[in-house]
């Protein structure tokens, strides 16, 4: 299975995987509006991959088959001040 991976023109580190290049027919319109203009990053052969960067490859395959797309959001940002306070033993 080969899928197309697009990055968002509006949201940093946000990617949309679709089964066919330039086929967004299964992606809900509100999601496409939030996503902005999809910018093609790569065509990705999922059947030859065992691991992806931060996405669970089994979940990507499953959602592509069931929903027709997979949306990868950026990981949550660490709050450095909270982490520093925790390291110092200071509770909020």
UniProtKB/Swiss-Prot annotation:
SUPFAM superfamilies: YcgL-like (SSF160191). Gene3D superfamilies: YcgL domain. PROSITE patterns: YCGL (PS51648). Pfam families: YcgL (PF05166). Residues 1-85 form the YcgL domain. PANTHER family: PROTEIN YCGL. This is YcgL domain-containing protein Sama_1929.
